[in-house]
Amino acid sequence: MPEYVNWLRHASPYINAHRDCTFVVMLPGDGVAHPNFGNIVHDLVLLHSLGVRLVLVHGSRPQIESRLAQRGITPRYHRDMRITDTETLECVIDAVGQLRISIEARLSMDMAASPMQGSRLRVTSGNVVTARPIGVLEGIDYQHTGEVRRVDRKGINRLLDERHIVLLSPLGYSPTGEIFNLACEDVATRAAIDLAADKLLLFGAETGLLDEQGRLVRELRPQQVPAHLQRLGGNYQAELLDAAAEACRGGVARSHIVSYAEDGALLTELFTRDGGGTLVAQEQFELVREAAIEDVGGLMDLITPLEEQGILVRRSREVLEREITQFSVVEREGLIIACAALYPIADSESGELACLAVNPEYRHGGRGDELLERIENRARALGIKTLFVLTTRTAHWFRERGFEPSSVDRLPSARASLYNFQRNSKIFEKAI
């Protein structure tokens, strides 16, 4: 079977979920200048064709720097914000204007090679961002540098309803006709909040947020962000992370940080279960909970391969339905990726931990330990003092977690009578 067939099958729930959703996408000036920009444009057009309501916010910092260099003007910054005097503002207007036109042209040019071939893709921009001056901070007059006051929510939604892609530049206008240079991150964050967007997607040079060992941090809650900001200092990843958290605190369900240098990063983030970047979200991305009858199908998908390998005892659908209240599960984006069951043993203060299973793709994230802790807590609440486990293949895993070798003679009679000598499982016990 071709690989793309399998990919489409896995992506189909996301295609359906994203239809008619509002996404605000922020692409910094470095991203527009990157060789992968053409692929990003194509992916944006694909999203539009799938029914996503798109607001694209572009940056322009390197393009402004180039204009300043051409005129021999030295850039001035304070706290990583540009001080925009009159001469600098002229360069900003020039760079932003040319870049906006270039993006519009690129979106139009890619139509022949996009899913929108044969239809009219409309890109619209305008004076929908109202701004105000930052003013004087710490004795520094920022002059024409501003901050977003509001975006025209009704106007933008009207355009999105009419199937326009809305393009926002890092310029804002005051009611008195002044022009202000804005940070594209600020524009994107405020647009996402004011539009009650479903997602804010932030492009950066890196794959996403990396930890101290250089590993990708896939998910974060807004309350976890400050610790990472302190570690990152004042680099651009910190700016993106701060913007993502601010959007979530403002009501945006999910914010994503992805790489503009990686071909397909946007689609990977949106149409695969684990994505390819960093997700910041208020709600729990992965949930440990008690199983419900609706989980039986997912449980069977998880444990059947392990039953076929002889690792787990076979359980029919009827058995699972009857014993579903004994199970705890780990759910990730609607998929059951791990499970465990607790069976109290009659006429004893003992219980059996059974059917502990983790999807092979998720076996290195501590989910087995998480389920074990949940089962132990549940057992204590039921007055169980000794937990037994029978296993044929994972003895060392349980030994490392405090289980001691045991025997059939140690099992309560109600469980010992059911012991399968042909299977010859090793028995372990743990006082809890």
UniProtKB/Swiss-Prot annotation:
Catalyses which reaction(s): L-glutamate + acetyl-CoA = N-acetyl-L-glutamate + CoA + H(+)
**Does Ligase count among this protein's keywords?**
no
Any one of the GO CC terms: cytoplasm
Pathway(s) this gene product operates in, as recorded in its UniProt entry: Amino-acid biosynthesis; L-arginine biosynthesis; N(2)-acetyl-L-ornithine from L-glutamate: step 1/4
Which InterPro entries does the record cross-reference, listed alphabetically? AceGlu_kinase-like_sf, Acyl_CoA_acyltransferase, Asp/Glu/Uridylate_kinase, GNAT_dom, NAGS_kin, NH2A_AcTrfase
The molecular function GO annotations come to: L-glutamate N-acetyltransferase activity
Q: Which Gene3D superfamilies match?
A: 3.40.630.30, Acetylglutamate kinase-like (3.40.1160.10)
- EC no. given is 2.3.1.1
Q: Which CDD domains match?
A: AAK_NAGS-ABP, NAT_SF
Q: Does the keyword Transferase apply?
A: yes
**What keywords are annotated for this sequence in UniProt?**
Acyltransferase, Amino-acid biosynthesis, Arginine biosynthesis, Cytoplasm, Transferase
**Biological processes per GO annotation:** L-arginine biosynthetic process
Q: Which residues form the N-acetyltransferase domain?
A: 286-425
Compartment annotation: Cytoplasm
Report the family membership: Belongs to the acetyltransferase family. ArgA subfamily.
Q: Which HAMAP family match?
A: N_acetyl_glu_synth (MF_01105)
Q: Which NCBIfam families match?
A: N-Ac-Glu-synth, PRK05279.1
* Protein name from the UniProt record: Amino-acid acetyltransferase
Q: Which gene encodes it?
A: argA
